[in-house]
Amino acid sequence: MKVQEGLFLVAIFFSLACTQLVKGQHQPGENCQNKCGNITIEYPFGISSGCYYPGNESFSITCKEDRPHVLSDIEVANFNHSGQLQVLLNRSSTCYDEQGKKTEEDSSFTLENLSLSANNKLTAVGCNALSLLDTFGMQNYSTACLSLCDSPPEADGECNGRGCCRVDVSAPLDSYTFETTSGRIKHMTSFHDFSPCTYAFLVEDDKFNFSSTEDLLNLRNVMRFPVLLDWSVGNQTCEQVGSTSICGGNSTCLDSTPRNGYICRCNEGFDGNPYLSAGCQDVNECTTSSTIHRHNCSDPKTCRNKVGGFYCKCQSGYRLDTTTMSCKRKEFAWTTILLVTTIGFLVILLGVACIQQRMKHLKDTKLREQFFEQNGGGMLTQRLSGAGPSNVDVKIFTEDGMKKATNGYAESRILGQGGQGTVYKGILPDNSIVAIKKARLGDSSQVEQFINEVLVLSQINHRNVVKLLGCCLETEVPLLVYEFITNGTLFDHLHGSMIDSSLTWEHRLKIAIEVAGTLAYLHSSASIPIIHRDIKTANILLDVNLTAKVADFGASRLIPMDKEELETMVQGTLGYLDPEYYNTGLLNEKSDVYSFGVVLMELLSGQKALCFKRPQSSKHLVSYFATATKENRLDEIIGGEVMNEDNLKEIQEAARIAAECTRLMGEERPRMKEVAAKLEALRVEKTKHKWSDQYPEENEHLIGGHILSAQGETSSSIGYDSIKNVAILDIETGR
């Protein structure tokens, strides 16, 4: 174990040593010469081995006659840390004597790991002078400039192509040999007096100003011009070198823009050589003479230096104006008064706002409680608790939730309007679609009906009854929330906007069976018997599969187990209203049977329950239907789209059932259990005939030929009773 710990410590030691070695090998030695004449040589440049950055001879400086030279023969005029080197390069010239004899001088130089900066210009001086720059490397590059004149140019100092021209230089980075050539495209002896020579040279921007005739004559005495060369450390980016860069403390590594590699720069507030480990030193902006780092405090006495910057400190009783960076006397009295007044005013405003918010909250709470009682919330709670166990969980929705769901009760969301109020389409936060029924404003009778509807629906859990999801009693009028049924009402399909939906006889029989089964369940199998009291086609909804959903239980009544009828105020819809109930005010399950009989007649005939366009004796569909049946004119009121040769007997049987349901005396009407069983028997018989027509041999084998051939009462009654028993069993189960 001790051996392993020892090895681990040794590994750490070597790692640290290697790191220091990497850092140390990029620093100059202690005894390096840093002067050549009057010019200071700064790292990464150096005069001798070990004094410049290793691996790049472009950083090696040769000191000749107290003048520094890079790449042996290019004189350096100035060093800087920003990745540029100012050097002096010879010009090229072509001169003519009075006889026209030509003398030429060309200039060429080689750059290895340095490159020509874009901050230089190729310049030509002279009349009809041509300046040409050729570069050689992986790619050869040439650029030229032409200066024209036939007389001395005006002395305006402009290098605009007359006697002088200049162009930008953008040589490829891989160029290593450069050559400037001067020439004259057409020599004239008249030029000799004012432009005997033409000159071509590279020069740093703004380092040469054309002086017309003086330069044309005297430029022969100027042999070299300042030129900028770009340099960088290595050929990797800052990200690639990471912590191994030679940038010292308080400096930043920057990727070289014109070429590969990187350069270093002292951070803001520091100055010095960023390539040395401690080269960047804090600048005292308060005392420095440098215009770059000098402070901007209006009074130097207020300047205070800090590491990497400065600040202006005013004496007690004064404040700093950041616009002018000067100290101004504090106005204590007015400032204090204004501050205290503002804070006091804000505190008062905040207190008033809090009180108003609290009062509004109390008012809203009281108003919601008032609406809750006004909308029968207490009565509903009392009745629900006294009605026995509920089969449905009734959710309480908030007023804000209902507003959002209906988009503020927008007219575009209205699904329908009727005696029980207005029904809106609502979208809940979970994107589920619901139907929201809103009672009419100012109609107190609606409250009782809404409470009654919640009370009734809380006792029902049936697949053919529209499901109550919840209610909202916090609003001025109560709201009920139901599941959304998408395919309209049966009335719409028979008489309204969806009359072209072409309900077949199979669809109509299915709807009749589902409605009859639902009523039978309400009358006989619900935990407390329920009479709907307003069965009509407008209260029967259809989903996309044409499954019937009985809705609108606002007029419904719960019948105590020990009673068969209730004495109530007559309520219902003309055309569907039981005449016996209308005359006596006694409500029982046979009233729903009558209303269902009218619905069945509508399904058979497609006629409205009450139509004033028909003759007086036939405006009620029950009378119209009874007369047609009695006179054997049933085919006149039942259209061809419903009745045909295949279903004639079924139509006649259904018509007979409808007639039984609408008898004047309630005791002569069948119970809904029986009606549902008879209609179910029609569907089973129809299915049996279809199957026997398709598979006659199998039918005879399974059922027995003697039963199929029997025509007596016994055989048919046995089949009917069996079917009826199955249907009744299905009704009683509800789901």
Curated annotation (Swiss-Prot):
Outcome of mutating R67Q: Decreases the binding to dimeric PGA
Entry's transmembrane regions: 332-352
Entry-linked InterPro entries: EGF-like_Ca-bd_dom, EGF-like_dom, EGF-type_Asp/Asn_hydroxyl_site, EGF_Ca-bd_CS, Kinase-like_dom_sf, NOTCH1_EGF-like, Prot_kinase_dom, Ser-Thr/Tyr_kinase_cat_dom
Tissue distribution: Predominantly expressed in green tissues such as stems and leaves. Detected at organ junctions.
Protein location: Membrane
Superkingdom of source: Eukaryota
Catalysed conversion reaction: L-seryl-[protein] + ATP = O-phospho-L-seryl-[protein] + ADP + H(+); L-threonyl-[protein] + ATP = O-phospho-L-threonyl-[protein] + ADP + H(+)
Keywords: ATP-binding, Calcium, Disulfide bond, EGF-like domain, Glycoprotein, Kinase, Membrane, Nucleotide-binding, Phosphoprotein, Repeat, Serine/threonine-protein kinase, Signal, Transferase, Transmembrane, Transmembrane helix
Reported induction: Induced by salicylic acid (SA) or INA, methyl jasmonate, ethylene, wounding and pathogen infection. Accumulated in roots after Aluminum exposure. Up-regulated by GRP3.
GO molecular function terms noted in the UniProt entry: ATP binding; calcium ion binding; kinase activity; polysaccharide binding; protein serine kinase activity; protein serine/threonine kinase activity
Signal peptide: 1-24
Similarity comment text for this entry: Belongs to the protein kinase superfamily. Ser/Thr protein kinase family.
Misc: Binding to polygalacturonic acid (PGA) multimers is calcium-dependent.
Annotated protein name in UniProt: Wall-associated receptor kinase 1
